[in-house]
């Protein structure tokens, strides 16, 4: 019935079977089916029969009779259903409209049946049937418009067969399927599809396109009716209707199996063997083929097998062809034995020295030579064969002499050859063999030798003997070179004659050579022929030309031999020629062998060791030393390769032709480690080739920007000062010189960059020697003066000045004289480190000292002054106001110079300079720790501020204090070695703002306690307004009580609002308390950091400063030593909740017990590195921002530990800004840029189609992306993403409803490659979606809360993934999308049916879909207020788009949910989580290690290890690791940033990329980095060098700590409640515009689950207000988390809030509402009170030292940072 339908309805047979794709035709020899399908003429016996059926006579159709090719039926006839094909849909639309098959793609020409659902397939027109010839895919088709007329008008007879492809015949029966497949495969190959047909292993050369897939599918079903297919084919098609390639693959495999006989014959006929594989392997291969044929009842005779084998022999084995050429009784075993013998011989030869070899020449194909010095023809006589094998003349090596061979005894020995010839018959022996170069025989084995006989060699041109016993008239060899047939040298020791005495008394003599390096003594027939002697091998005799028999010859083995009894001995007992002994023929060891045995030692070492008997059982005479000295071992050349020796003085001669300052040498030295950040770590030096003038410049880094600035400076200097132009600069190949920036700089200025060759730094000797000289001088100067190491560059600069002024030994002038400069004025030079006294012309008091000790460094670059180091102030100054200190060579000397004083000489030398001293000083300009004394004078203010210590009153009016002179403790004479650990840049002028000291708050607060310290608020971790260690005011003697009490009478406090409080009278009771920590003042500088005798003053007062409302003093119970404020809870259960219960199990730092008198402040910082114009950044404030300051105590160096070695220096715009004017500048204002930052723009991490596939040079990656591409297309079709029944014209659709589409590609974290077809939702019209719909995902806090609860309750955690989740959600709007690009349908549109990725509404649609399913089918409920968190009585689900995390006490409950999900969605189990051991998860980017009932570790080490190196940030993987993400005291320059437009965009993009990744990591689990991330994120639009440096430092810290994890441990099971705690902190006014930074950390049962650091939205006017703002930000989230915890776990919950602000706690507790200073503050405080009381919230005080939220609000010193974080992240 089906065949009848096919016969009646031809339209259904073709359809779109002819979809076209232009493709290269693959040659048949490259086809994977070359043997199995198309290239075997005997492949199928039925092929001739089928071909004959298709032959036609001329003028008739060449198409075979086919039931499919019949007259068309009316259009009303329904399309047929061709068997089972009709059950399935077809592929996606193809590119046929624009292809060569366009004339079959017209709507009236294409078939459209039920199984062809794609719009690409159409019905043929009833009046115009399909052509009988199918054009190949590469054939150009006619114009689609005129296709109908062409088909109707062109007769079939006129069709050109050469331009068409003959279609296969129709399958007629199931038995003929294998035959039909052969023709079908040929048909596809003729259609240029041969490279996509699989071979029998299923391998293909390339992936087919969808058009080609459609073409194969349709042609297969057109010519192979389903009911005639074999059963196995039907089974494949029922599983996958379009898997035609599997059918072809299995068909080919079956054909291969059925035709194994043919394969074996082909393999046997094509045998080849050249010795590259072992003979055994070859024998096994051949035997296996013959045995397989024998099993198929096909016997292969030995003769036939030998003939086939001999035909394929080559190389050394080709000789066997001649041996077996005439044999009729060849045995296969004998042939294999011969092959094995030759193989073994070659193997032995390859292991020995080339000059030694074994004479098995019957298996060697070597060239033969005979002399041509005589016309005597050498012939052979007939002989009788002694056995079945043909005897042959001995084939020895082809011995030839060189052209330098000298004549001996007036007989000249020449090299000659004879023409090659084959043996003509069995009775003729040729003197030559077929000429063929082969490998030499190196063995000296002579098992086949006949003792005391000479081997008669028909091919040797010379006679060679191994013993000199028979050699007459022997002379040493000097010029003779002998080579064998393989062109290998044979060393010759001596030359002489052999004298023969034959039977009849005939005597003759022939020339002979002596060498011990042959296997046999060779008698040359050519030499005998010269004496008219021939060999008769039939009678085995030597005869004269007249027939006289001279001697018999003996056949031994395969060779003929002559006895040595006919030789006349030379009667020489011992021959001394070349140490050859007659007693024995020495077989010496080849030198290469000994060289390898002795570990590739050199020639001289081996020879000397043998002479000294260092190696036993081996003598020097046992080794062949010829050519040993010139032997080149390949392994030694590779393994011992070294760079060439640099030739001294090899600089190019043309360098001398340059004028001064035209040719420069430059080099960089560094880094110098363990220095302060302000000190340079590198220097770059320049030397002029002509004058040898030298320059040095300090550098803090080696970045290309820094180097470029230096080059700009020196070129400008040379141009302006010397009127010269630099033409050439010679450098090494360091990256700082070879970068594109510097190369472009040189090119633009016409400067030639001359680089050294690779790994030849010695060629850069001028610059290298200068650096070495300068460093030698530096070490010497520092050692002599005793100055600290951070002044190393001052020593280098001093040395440069001196070296430029002195005459070098090779020159007659100094560099200065060569440059045309005057000589050095010695009166302007002081010894390096010379002690001086610097005048302080602006002291604070007239009675204070006017001089400060210092040490002279070098003359100033920018003034007539001198650079002098002041140890007491830890800085250098540029001044002329100094006096040389008499009788002291150096205050820092470690040596005794009592007898070496130079005071008189110095006075005499500097007398002229003394009169020049004035009071005008200038500031040193280059970036080294120097300032003019105008700057430091403001620092020398002895007791300029009122005497206030760390715990004085809240506000002290300095007008009420009378100044009293205090003795100043000077700095020690010797500078401590640890001074290099300090940050030595000076602070600017201090603010005259009165000090307002409060241990908690400097503006507003409640009670004051003398027993507590609050160092947090000491000027927001900047020391700009603090006294630094070592400053004069820190050394004030405070031993007198009267002196302390003086000035404390009648002190009145002043509020910022202008009102004054009553005077605080002097109180003799408890108002003032004194505590003495140490009664003995310390003289040591380091110990001076601790207090000597310091009164601790606590003033209790009801007055509240800073406009805070008046609050009653805390009752006595609140002033307990534990510093805990009672809870503010009205709940009756509050009596069971204590501060200890709240603080219990929190990861707070463990502090060592401190005595009540310990007032050290762990949060103070060392002096900061500042720039002149600053704004707040990482914890610092500008002077204009400072409202109040706090005078802090000094602390020990270990508390002030800072990062010095690795952290980067801040950017200095003055010195490091490029002098070259850019093309266009963009002015960036800091504040405007910060305001412009709305959010961190995500950086694109995906690839476009052209990046992933079209232009991807990584073929392996490209193939994976192509595979992912096809997989995505299949999934889209499977999910019915769009309507495949109809294409819509682009012009007929409203443009608002049209959505652009694109492919994006990316590589997932597990290494898989992903392709996704997405809509361009970013340009989607607002009318096409509901803006109220939201795409919800699980909040990170919800996930962390769920993980924490899972750990505490031993839950199983299961991870699932739903494939193509969005495509399960229908779309309601009428939207159209452009087809995928590979279809080429640019003017067509598809109607969307599913929520394609990228649409605005896709996320919301999917959320509603999965939410409905979870609620209705899985009995889940969504937790109120927490989207995407679902739960029922047993299971909790966290949903993030297509990722699901299941939590349950019972694993079976999770499995039940999975089963339900699989009914509707393609659900994949990523991790079931059933193991009791540690399980590793990758959940939303978090790498989690979880062991139930024990612990959970959260990190991102793998991800960071992969991603951070790709950021192009200069990481330092082997250097010292950073120990903190940033340092206190860093400031961002607030000057407007001038930058090129392109460079600005590039740097903004870089900042977005870096901060984007840092934010992702920080908010996942690295909460300790959030402050730095938030601060730097505000400067994304202000990418100055300083901002980038700070960002790089953050990335470096992330790299150094990438292995850190957030550690959780299971909560104690005895605790019945869940404890949720928020820890709050604020840093007042440390952000731009005086904004405060606030931070909160949230903990559940002692586990940190989240953190937040942000800038306060409103400007706070006091510290307390900032703290209130921080607390008010934490409470809402704390309440929401509380609700979530109660929903997920039904235990009771305790909520706690911890803050280190007592003022905030007092405001929350107080009921006084009258003195709130403004409405906003009052409403904020009132709301805070209501939230605390209404939510059962316990508020407690936490010490600042333990407040881990401190890391969220400010940068901290390393020790403090570690102390606060090491408990919860490590």
Swiss-Prot record:
Stretch list, region RNA-binding: 295-397
Domain Reverse transcriptase Ty1/copia-type, chain residue ranges per copy: 1353-1491
Low complexity: compositionally biased ranges: 369-382
EC number: 3.4.23.-, 2.7.7.49, 2.7.7.7, 3.1.26.4
Key words, A-Z: Aspartyl protease, ATP-binding, Cytoplasm, DNA integration, DNA recombination, DNA-binding, DNA-directed DNA polymerase, Endonuclease, Hydrolase, Magnesium, Metal-binding, Multifunctional enzyme, Nuclease, Nucleotide-binding, Nucleotidyltransferase, Nucleus, Protease, RNA-binding, RNA-directed DNA polymerase, Transferase, Transposable element, Transposition, Viral release from host cell, Virion maturation, Zinc, Zinc-finger
SUPFAM superfamilies attached to this UniProt entry: DNA/RNA polymerases, Ribonuclease H-like
Known catalytic reactions: DNA(n) + a 2'-deoxyribonucleoside 5'-triphosphate = DNA(n+1) + diphosphate; Endonucleolytic cleavage to 5'-phosphomonoester
GO MF term set: aspartic-type endopeptidase activity; ATP binding; DNA binding; DNA-directed DNA polymerase activity; RNA binding; RNA-directed DNA polymerase activity; RNA-DNA hybrid ribonuclease activity; zinc ion binding
PTM entry text: Initially, virus-like particles (VLPs) are composed of the structural unprocessed proteins Gag and Gag-Pol, and also contain the host initiator methionine tRNA (tRNA(i)-Met) which serves as a primer for minus-strand DNA synthesis, and a dimer of genomic Ty RNA. Processing of the polyproteins occurs within the particle and proceeds by an ordered pathway, called maturation.
Main location: cytoplasm
GO biological process per UniProt: DNA integration; DNA recombination; proteolysis; transposition; viral translational frameshifting
Location of the Integrase catalytic domain: 656-831
Disulphide linkage map: none
Chain sites annotated for binding Mg(2+) 3: 1625, 1667, 1700
Active-site residue list: 457 (for protease activity)
Residues where Mg(2+) 1 binds: 667, 732
Residues annotated as binding Mg(2+) 2: 1361, 1442-1443
Region (Integrase-type zinc finger-like): 579-636
Site location (Cleavage): 397-398, 578-579, 1232-1233
InterPro entries: DNA/RNA_pol_sf, Integrase_cat-core, PolX-like_BBD, Retrotran_Ty1/copia-like, RNaseH-like_sf, RNaseH_sf, RVT_2, TYA
Statement: the UniProt record of this protein carries the keyword DNA-binding: yes
Subunit structure: The capsid protein forms a homotrimer, from which the VLPs are assembled. The protease is a homodimer, whose active site consists of two apposed aspartic acid residues.
Function: Capsid protein (CA) is the structural component of the virus-like particle (VLP), forming the shell that encapsulates the retrotransposons dimeric RNA genome. The particles are assembled from trimer-clustered units and there are holes in the capsid shells that allow for the diffusion of macromolecules. CA also has nucleocapsid-like chaperone activity, promoting primer tRNA(i)-Met annealing to the multipartite primer-binding site (PBS), dimerization of Ty2 RNA and initiation of reverse transcription.
Protein name: Transposon Ty2-C Gag-Pol polyprotein
Species, as recorded: Saccharomyces cerevisiae (strain ATCC 204508 / S288c) (Baker's yeast)
Gene that encodes it: TY2B-C
């Amino acid at each position: 019935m089906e065949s009848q339908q096919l016969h009646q309805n031809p339209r259904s047979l073709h359809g779109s079977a002819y979809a076209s794709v232009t493709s290269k035709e693959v040659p048949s020899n490259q086809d994977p089916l070359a043997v199995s399908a198309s290239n075997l003429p005997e492949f199928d016996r039925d092929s001739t029969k089928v071909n004959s059926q298709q032959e036609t006579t001329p003028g008739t159709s060449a198409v075979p009779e086919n039931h499919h090719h019949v007259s068309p039926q009316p259009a009303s006839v329904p399309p047929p259903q061709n068997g089972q094909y009709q059950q399935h849909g077809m592929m996606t639309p193809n590119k046929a409209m624009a292809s060569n098959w366009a004339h079959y793609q017209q709507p009236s020409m294409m078939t459209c049946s039920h199984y062809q659902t794609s719009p690409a397939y159409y019905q043929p027109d009833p009046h115009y049937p399909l052509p009988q010839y199918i054009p190949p895919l590469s054939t150009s088709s006619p114009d689609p418009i005129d296709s109908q007329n062409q088909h109707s008008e062109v007769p079939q007879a006129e069709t050109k067969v050469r331009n068409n492809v003959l279609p296969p015949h129709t399958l007629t029966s199931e038995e003929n399927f294998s035959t039909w497949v052969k023709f079908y495969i040929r048909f596809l190959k003729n259609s240029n599809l041969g490279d996509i047909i699989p071979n029998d292993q299923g391998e293909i050369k390339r992936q087919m396109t969808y058009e080609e897939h459609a073409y194969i599918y349709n042609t297969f079903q057109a010519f192979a009716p389903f009911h005639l297919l074999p059963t196995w084919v039907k089974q494949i098609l029922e599983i996958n209707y379009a898997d035609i390639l599997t059918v072809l693959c299995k068909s080919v495999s079956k054909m291969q199996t059925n035709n194994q006989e043919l394969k074996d014959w082909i393999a046997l006929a094509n045998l080849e063997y050249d010795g590259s594989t072992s003979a055994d392997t070859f024998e096994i291969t051949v035997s296996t083929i013959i045995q397989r044929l024998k099993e198929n009842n096909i016997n292969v005779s030995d003769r036939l097998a030998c003939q086939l084998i001999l035909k394929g022999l080559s190389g050394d084995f080709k000789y066997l062809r001649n041996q077996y050429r005439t044999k009729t009784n060849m045995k296969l075993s004998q042939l294999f034995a011969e092959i094995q013998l030759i193989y073994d011989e070659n193997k032995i030869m390859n292991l020995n020295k080339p000059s030694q070899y074994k004479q098995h020449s019957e298996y060697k194909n070597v060239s033969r030579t005979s002399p041509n010095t005589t016309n005597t023809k050498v012939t052979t006589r007939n002989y009788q064969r002694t056995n079945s094998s043909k005897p042959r003349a001995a084939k020895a090596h082809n011995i030839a002499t060189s052209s330098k061979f000298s004549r001996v005894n007036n007989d000249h020995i020449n090299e000659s050859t004879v023409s090659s010839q084959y043996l003509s018959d069995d009775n003729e022996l040729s003197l030559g063999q077929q000429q063929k170069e082969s490998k030499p025989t190196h063995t000296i084995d002579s098992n086949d030798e006949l003792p005391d006989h000479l081997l008669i060699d028909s091919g040797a041109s010379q006679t060679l003997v191994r013993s000199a016993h028979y050699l007459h008239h022997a002379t040493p060899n000097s010029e003779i070179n002998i080579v064998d047939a393989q062109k290998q040298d044979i060393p010759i020791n001596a030359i002489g004659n052999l004298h023969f005495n034959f039977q009849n008394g005939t005597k003759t003599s022939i020339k002979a050579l002596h060498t011990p390096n042959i296997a046999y003594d060779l008698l040359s027939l050519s030499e005998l022929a010269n004496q008219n002697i021939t060999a008769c091998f039939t009678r085995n005799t030597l005869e004269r030309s007249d027939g006289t028999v001279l001697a018999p010859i003996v056949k031994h083995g395969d060779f003929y031999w002559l006895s040595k009894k006919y030789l006349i001995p030379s009667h020489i007992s011992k021959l001394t020629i070349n140490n050859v002994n007659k007693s024995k023929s020495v077989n010496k060891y080849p030198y290469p062998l000994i060289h390898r045995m002795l570990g590739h030692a050199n020639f001289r070492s081996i020879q000397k060791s043998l002479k000294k008997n260092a190696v036993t059982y081996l003598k020097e005479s046992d080794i062949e030393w010829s050519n040993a000295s010139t032997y080149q071992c390949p392994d030694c050349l590779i393994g011992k390769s070294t760079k060439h020796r640099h030739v001294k003085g090899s600089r190019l001669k043309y360098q001398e032709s340059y004028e001064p300052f035209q040719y420069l040498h430059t080099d960089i030295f560094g880094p110098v480690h363990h220095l302060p950040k302000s000190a340079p770590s590198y220097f770059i030096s320049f030397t002029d080739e002509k004058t040898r003038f030298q320059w040095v410049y300090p550098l803090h880094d080696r970045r290309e920007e820094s180097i470029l600035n230096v080059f700009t400076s020196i070129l400008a200097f040379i141009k302006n000062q010397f009127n010269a132009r630099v033409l050439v600069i010679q450098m090494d190949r360091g990256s700082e010189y070879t970068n594109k920036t510097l190369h472009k700089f040189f090119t633009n200025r016409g400067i030639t960059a001359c680089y050294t060759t690779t790994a030849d730094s010695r060629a850069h000797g001028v610059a290298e020697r200068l650096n070495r000289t300068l460093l030698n001088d530096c070490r010497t100067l520092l050692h002599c003066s005793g100055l600290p190491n951070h002044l190393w560059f001052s020593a280098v600069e001093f040395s440069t000045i001196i070296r430029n002024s002195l005459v070098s030994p090779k020159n007659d002038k100094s560099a200065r004289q060569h440059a045309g400069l005057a000589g050095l004025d010695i009166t302007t030079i002081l010894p390096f480190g010379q002690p001086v006294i610097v005048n302080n012309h602006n002291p604070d008091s007239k009675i204070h000292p006017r001089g400060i000790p210092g040490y002279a460094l070098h003359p100033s670059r920018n003034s007539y002054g001198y650079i002098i180091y002041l140890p007491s102030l830890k800085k250098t100054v540029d001044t002329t106001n100094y006096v040389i200190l008499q009788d002291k060579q150096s205050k820092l000397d470690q040596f005794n110079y009592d007898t070496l004083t130079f005071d008189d000489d110095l006075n005499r030398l500097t007398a002229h300079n003394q009169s020049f001293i004035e009071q005008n000083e200038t500031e040193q300009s280059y970036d080294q720790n120097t300032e003019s004394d105008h700057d430091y004078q403001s620092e020398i203010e002895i007791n300029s501020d009122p005497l206030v210590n760390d715990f004085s009153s809240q506000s002290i009016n300095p007008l009420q204090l009378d100044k009293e002179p205090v003795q100043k403790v000077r700095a020690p004479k010797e500078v401590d070695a640890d001074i290099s650990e300090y940050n030595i840049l000076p602070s600017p002028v201090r603010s005259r703002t009165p000090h307002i000291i409060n241990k908690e708050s400097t503006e507003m607060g409640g009670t004051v306690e003398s027993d507590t310290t609050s160092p947090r608020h000491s000027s927001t971790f900047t020391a700009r307004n603090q006294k630094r260690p070592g400053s004069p005011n820190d050394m004030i003697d405070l031993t007198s009580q009267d002196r302390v009490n003086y000035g404390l009478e009648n002190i009145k406090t002043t509020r910022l609002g202008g009102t004054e409080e009553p005077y605080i009278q002097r109180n003799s009771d408890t108002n003032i308390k004194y505590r003495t920590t140490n009664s003995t003042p310390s003289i040591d500088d380091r110990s001076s950091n601790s207090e000597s005798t310091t009164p601790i003053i606590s003033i209790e007062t009801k007055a509240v400063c800073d406009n805070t409302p008046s609050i009653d003093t805390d009752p006595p119970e609140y002033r307990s030593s534990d510093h805990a404020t009672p809870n503010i809870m009205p709940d009756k259960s509050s009596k069971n909740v204590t501060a200890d219960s709240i603080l219990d199990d929190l990861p707070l730092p463990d502090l060592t017990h401190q005595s009540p008198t310990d007032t050290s402040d762990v949060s103070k910082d060392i002096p900061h590195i500042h720039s002149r114009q600053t704004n707040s950044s990482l914890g610092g404030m500008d002077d204009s921002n400072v409202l109040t300051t706090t005078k802090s105590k000094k602390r020990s160096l270990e508390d002030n530990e800072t990062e010095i070695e690795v952290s980067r220096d801040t950017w200095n715009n003055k010195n490091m800004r490029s002098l070259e004017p850019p093309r266009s500048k963009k002015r960036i204002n800091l504040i405007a840029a910060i305001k412009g930052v709305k959010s961190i723009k995500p950086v694109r991490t995906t690839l476009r189609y052209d990046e992933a596939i079209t232009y991807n040079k990584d073929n392996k990656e490209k193939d994976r992306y192509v595979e992912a591409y096809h997989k995505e297309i299949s999934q889209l079709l499977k999910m019915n993403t769009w309507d495949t029944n109809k294409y819509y014209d682009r012009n007929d659709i409203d443009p608002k409803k049209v959505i652009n589409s694109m492919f994006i590609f990316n590589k997932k974290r597990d290494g898989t490659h992903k392709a996704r077809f997405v809509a361009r939702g970013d340009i989607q019209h607002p009318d096409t979606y509901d803006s109220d719909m939201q795409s919800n995902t699980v909040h990170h806090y919800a996930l962390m809360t769920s993980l924490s609860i899972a750990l505490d309750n031993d839950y199983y955690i299961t991870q699932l993934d739903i494939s193509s989740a969005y495509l399960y959600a229908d779309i309601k709007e009428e939207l159209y999308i452009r087809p995928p690009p590979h279809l080429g349908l640019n003017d067509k549109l598809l109607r969307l049916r599913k929520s394609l990725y990228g649409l605005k509404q896709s996320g919301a649609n999917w959320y509603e879909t999965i939410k409905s399913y979870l609620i209705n089918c899985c009995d889940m409920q969504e937790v109120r207020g927490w989207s995407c968190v679902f739960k029922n009585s047993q299971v909790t689900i966290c949903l993030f788009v297509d990722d699901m995390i299941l939590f349950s006490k019972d694993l079976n409950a999770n499995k039940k949910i999975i089963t339900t999900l699989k009914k509707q969605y393609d659900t994949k189990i990523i991790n079931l989580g059933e193991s009791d051991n540690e399980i590793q998860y990758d959940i939303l980017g978090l790498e989690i290690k979880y062991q139930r009932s024990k612990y959970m570790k959260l990190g991102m080490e793998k991800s960071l290890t992969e991603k951070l190196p790709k950021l192009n940030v200069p990481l330092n993987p082997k250097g010292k690791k950073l120990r903190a993400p940033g340092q206190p005291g860093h400031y961002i320059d607030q000057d407007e940033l001038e930058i090129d437009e392109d460079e600005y965009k590039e740097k903004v993009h870089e900042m977005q990329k870096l901060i984007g990744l840092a934010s992702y990591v920080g908010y996942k689990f690295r909460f300790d980095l959030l402050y730095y991330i938030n601060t730097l994120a505000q400067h994304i639009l202000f990418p100055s060098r300083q901002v980038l440096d700070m960002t790089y430092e953050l990335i470096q810290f992330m790299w150094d700590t990438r292995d850190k994890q957030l550690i959780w441990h299971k909560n104690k099971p005895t605790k019945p409640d869940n404890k949720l705690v928020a820890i709050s902190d604020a840093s007042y006014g440390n952000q731009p515009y005086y904004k405060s930074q606030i931070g909160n950390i949230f903990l559940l049962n002692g586990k940190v689950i989240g953190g937040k650091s942000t800038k306060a939205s409103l400007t706070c006017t006091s510290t307390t207000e900032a703290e209130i703002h921080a607390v008010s930000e934490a409470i809402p989230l704390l309440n929401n988390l509380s609700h979530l915890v109660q929903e997920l776990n039904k235990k009771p919950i305790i909520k706690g809030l911890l803050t280190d602000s007592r003022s905030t706690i007092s405001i929350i507790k107080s009921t006084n509402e009258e003195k709130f200073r403004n409405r906003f503050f009052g409403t904020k405080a009132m709301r805070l009170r209501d939230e605390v009381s209404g939510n059962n919230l316990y508020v407690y005080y936490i010490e600042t030292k333990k407040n881990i939220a401190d890391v969220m609000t400010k940068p901290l010193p390393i020790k403090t940072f570690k102390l606060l974080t090491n408990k919860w992240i490590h």
